[in-house]
From Swiss-Prot:
DNA-binding segment(s): 18-37
Entries under PROSITE patterns matching the protein: HTH_CROC1 (PS50943)
InterPro entries: Cro/C1-type_HTH (IPR001387), Lambda_DNA-bd_dom_sf (IPR010982)
The name this protein goes by in its record: HTH-type transcriptional activator BcrR
Any one annotated GO CC term: plasma membrane
GO molecular function list: DNA binding
Family matches, as CDD domains: HTH_XRE
Annotated phenotype, changing residue 33 to L: Loss of activity. Does not affect DNA-binding and cellular localization
Length: 204
């Protein structure tokens, strides 16, 4: 008997609905439905809760092959989380581009490297774009970390797409504005994000 059949049998044996079992295990009814339909397995924490609630061992719930599948799924899930956290941190690193002296201020025929707070040798429009891009990346990075912590994969996916788009546009804009230092660093940031994104895609 497969895990999904065992879970359904144990639940009906206690005369519980999927909703009632979900409340006991502190998961959603959708999760119970997915497990009972054979579309996925619970993580180790949920599996321990199921084992304790029904007073059965994990070995009784899962066959050897299912345990291997669960371990592989858990490993992929953990790696994806790590990559998501790294991605969020990369976005939040945009705060460094505000405080590092990466912009050229021309004063009396000399060019001085200054941070964005002191940068005046550009148009108000350009400054607005610089600040908007960095603020957006920082906010997206925070959102990415929060969505990962809350297991909101859909939100994380949207954040990733927005982040890649903004970073790519920022590279083009800084290059057009002839800001070599920040262009190179944002380009390297984009490469790092693409690398992490490709690794994430490989986990599916």
């Amino acid at each position: 008997m497969e895990f999904n059949e065992k879970l359904q049998q144990l639940r009906t044996g206690k005369n519980l609905t999927q909703e009632q079992l979900a409340e006991q295990l502190y998961v959603s009814r959708t999760a119970i439905s997915k497990w009972e339909s054979g579309k996925g397995y619970p993580n180790m924490e949920s599996l321990k809760c199921i084992s304790k609630f029904f007073s059965v061992t994990i070995d009784e719930l899962l066959s050897g092959e299912e345990l291997i599948t669960l371990a592989e799924t858990e490993n992929r899930s953990n790696l994806k989380k790590i990559y998501n956290y790294i991605y969020g941190i990369l976005d939040m690193m945009a705060v460094a581009f505000i405080f590092l002296p990466l912009y050229g201020n021309s004063v009396g025929g000399y060019v001085y490297a200054v941070n964005l707070l002191s940068f005046t040798a550009t148009t108000p429009f350009n400054l607005a774009v610089y600040w908007s891009a960095f603020a957006a990346l920082i906010i997206i990075g925070i959102g990415k970390i929060i969505s990962t912590h809350l297991d909101k994969e859909k939100w994380g996916g949207i954040a990733t797409k927005c982040s890649l788009t903004i970073t790519a546009l920022a590279v083009c804009f800084f290059a057009a504005a002839r800001e070599p230092y920040i262009t190179v660093l944002v380009f390297l940031l984009l490469i790092g994000k693409i690398f992490v994104w490709i690794k994430q895609m490989g986990m599916k």
